[in-house]
Swiss-Prot record:
Protein name: Chitoporin
Family indicated by similarity: Belongs to the outer membrane porin (Opr) (TC 1.B.25) family.
Name of the gene encoding the protein in the UniProt record: chiP
Annotated organism of origin: Salmonella typhimurium (strain LT2 / SGSC1412 / ATCC 700720)
GO biological process, one term: polysaccharide transport
Record InterPro entries: OM_porin_bac, Porin_dom_sf
């Protein structure tokens, strides 16, 4: 087991600050009571064990350890009420404890902390235990208007989003928005966010933003977005975002729900677009023209026990990168963006030209006298994945006229405790078999986001609790 490291001093100062506030804030009791009386302190204990093997086509197609580790997380999340019904404070921290890790396991494993504290310093050399302050924000509300500033996670309608392990990543910045309810005519909500630093949940220190060369500064990211709920089961959303002087991103989504055979049927169309401002064939020139990912989703719930999903995506990402990214800075874990498609089948299925179809089902076993139990399965098939349309230094496997296929299936078993002190604790076992239908090595041949065949097993425990 590795020793603790990280931001003990930062966390201690933050907690001390909250404690001290009760002594030195002088406001009328009627105004201060909301801050304390409406506050909450929640948390959780989390366990993650993973065994993932990946085929090495350069060494006789042997499967080799890619991830093999067992890690604990725990968090505390304090959310105040509002003093004078206007001002509040949120603060949260979590710890990661590396219990075991195979020496051949890849880094970072994204559940513990990387040995490198900052995203742009990442050298994939190892993981460690530690503590991270992931939320420390002042908050404000007045009528339909709200705002937050500090260490925050986006909550509004913008394109900005954090990475997730058990805990979310953190932006340094500010977000503000408003919501207006027009009765039967619908409800409008919109927000704006600005940020100048970010850390993924497996990094302990904030880092600035850069272009793909990791040298050219990007001073800030910002985004604005809106949602209109027509209150007739039709919802429209749109957003625009920018990394300063570098990448513009676009988002639109239409969702609709209706009854089919007495059961709810949901559908959506989603569009994600990105365009960079560099056109000089340098490393910062990631797309040629506008790249996009389109998605069509269908969901159907049968007899309140079976959830069915049918979803499809289509990608266009001409240029040097060769795949679509929802974030506005291309470097790994440097920022993140909204993407409402999640299949948990290993690949992102986002190569240039790639089309993918997903089918999934979850079955609640409560009618079999097994309350809390659920089982599921899913399958993805993808085709027409093209490599980058150009590369400065292509490898021997690069052929711009090639296309490849990918496929994957997953099995799930979930149990959630239904009563007792540990009510709500969830145990989940997830297995994935992924197949890259080619003999190209991982990340090779101009496929910068496609790896070789994998077998992946995850065991997860989530135990939430409330202190007050």
């Amino acid at each position: 087991m590795r020793t603790f490291s990280g931001k003990r001093s930062t966390l201690a100062l933050a907690i001390a600050g909250i404690t001290a506030m009760s002594g030195w804030i002088v406001v009328p009791q009627a105004q201060a009571s909301g801050f304390f009386d409406d506050s909450t302190l929640t948390g959780g204990i989390y366990y993650w064990q993973r065994e993932r093997d990946r085929k090495d086509v350069t060494d006789g197609d042997k499967y080799k350890t890619n991830l093999s580790h067992a890690t604990w997380n725990a968090n505390l999340d304090f959310q105040s009420g509002y003093a004078a019904d206007m001002f509040g404070l949120d603060i949260a921290a979590f710890t990661a404890i590396e219990m075991a890790e195979n020496g051949d396991s890849g880094h970072p494993n994204e559940i513990a902390f990387s040995k490198k504290n900052k995203g742009y310093d990442e050298d994939y050399s190892g993981d460690k235990s530690g503590i991270s302050l992931y939320k420390a924000a002042a908050k404000f509300k007045y009528g339909p208007v709200w705002a937050r500033a500090g260490y925050i996670q986006p909550t509004g309608q913008t394109l900005l989003a954090p990475h997730w392990s058990f805990m979310p990543g953190t932006y340094q910045g500010a977000e503000a928005g408003a919501s207006f309810d027009y009765g039967d005519a619908g409800a409008l909500s919109f927000s704006y966010m600005w940020t100048n630093e970010y850390k993924a949940p497996w990094h302990t220190e904030m880092d600035k933003f850069y272009q793909a060369d990791k040298k050219t500064n990007v001073d800030y990211l910002h985004s604005i977005g809106a949602k209109y709920d027509f209150k007739n089961d039709l919802v429209l959303e749109a957003a625009f975002g920018q990394s300063e002087g570098y990448v513009d991103q676009y988002f639109a989504k239409a969702s609709y729900k209706f009854d089919l055979g007495g059961n709810p049927f949901t559908t959506s169309y989603q569009f994600y677009g990105a365009r960079d401002k560099v056109d000089d064939r340098s490393v910062n020139d990631i797309y040629d023209g506008t790249a996009w990912l389109q998605a069509l989703t269908f969901g159907y719930k049968v007899a309140e026990v079976v959830d069915l999903r049918l979803e499809g995506t289509w990608v266009k990402a001409d240029g040097q990168q060769g795949y679509f990214l929802q974030r506005m800075t291309p470097t790994y874990a440097s920022s993140n963006g909204r993407l409402d498609i999640w299949w948990d089948n290993r690949s992102d299925f986002n190569a240039n030209g790639e089309k993918a179809v997903f089918f999934g089902a979850m079955y609640d076993l409560k009618n079999w006298n097994l309350p809390g139990w659920a089982v599921g399965a899913s399958y993805v098939y993808a085709w027409d994945a093209k490599p980058a349309t150009w590369q400065s230094n292509p490898d021997a496997y690069y052929d711009k006229n090639r296309t490849i296929e990918e496929s994957s299936y997953s099995l799930d078993a979930v149990y959630t405790l239904q009563e007792g002190r540990a009510k709500g604790t969830m145990f989940k076992l997830h297995f994935t078999e992924y197949d890259n239908h080619s003999n190209i090595p991982s990340w090779g041949g101009g496929y910068g986001n496609i790896f070789q065949d994998e077998r992946d097993v995850k065991f997860i425990v989530i135990a939430p609790f409330t202190i007050f």
